[in-house]
Regions:
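Short beta-strand/loop segment that forms part of the nucleotide-sugar
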Residues: 51-59
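Short phosphate-binding loop-to-helix
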Residues: 65-98, 158
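A short, N-terminal amphipathic alpha-helix
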Residues: 32-51
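Conserved donor-nucleotide/metal-binding helix-loop-beta segment in metal-dependent transferases, i.e.
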Residues: 109-135
Length: 199
């Protein structure tokens, strides 16, 4: 059974996304980075036949802006609610079986990381990709149709996000961890990773 990947993204538009990064490097540079990272991620993961890729975007109406997205990828809106509600809904909308949800701001992310996360779901109920800043770059569930409680009372965009999500899990839920990666949220991480990743 092929796994499913939900790419969780904001439609690239000047002044709307990556606000902390834009404060440090400017709106135009942040927009350029956002577009480049999304295109790179979809190119890296979208052609791999080991999984099915779905792009879930906000705002919802952006899914109709065909010039923004590759033609061969399924696109849907994130819908209403806070970040946790939208993430849970996106995972639950996947067909039965293993499903992963990822963001678009992890320059190192490649097919090997995704394959490893799906392997972990062969042994664990849920899997997380910890981020250097205390958040997470990936969350996945062995059975998308039967998600445990994950996203209630989470302090998003801070050093406690992953710890808060883990604290929500019932004791019987087994947890695996993918490698720790760094996401780009501000000028410091942008300049640190740009040296190695060429964006």
């Amino acid at each position: 059974m092929r796994g499913h990947i939900v790419v969780f993204a904001r439609a690239p538009a000047l002044g709307t996304g990556k606000r902390r990064l834009a404060r440090d490097i400017g709106d135009l540079a942040a927009l350029r980075f956002e577009r480049q990272m999304l295109a790179r991620l979809l190119r890296r993961l979208g052609r791999d036949r080991r999984w099915h890729l779905r792009l879930t975007v906000t705002p919802d109406h952006a899914r109709h802006r065909k010039h923004l997205w590759p033609r061969a990828i399924q696109i849907c809106g994130q819908g209403r609610g806070d970040l946790g509600q939208r993430m849970r809904r996106a995972l639950a909308a996947c067909p039965p079986g293993p499903a992963l949800l990822i963001g678009t701001d992890i320059p190192a992310l490649g097919p090997g990381h995704i394959a490893e996360a799906f392997r972990l779901l062969g042994r664990y109920d849920v899997v997380f990709g910890p981020a250097v800043d205390g958040g997470f770059w990936l969350v996945g569930a062995r059975r998308s149709s039967c998600l445990p409680p994950l996203f209630g009372k989470v302090r998003w965009s801070g050093p406690h996000a992953l710890a808060d999500v883990l604290a929500n899990l019932p004791p019987h839920v087994s947890v695996g961890f993918a490698p720790r990666l760094e996401d780009v949220d501000d000028g410091g991480s942008f300049h640190r990773l740009a040296t190695h990743r060429g964006f």
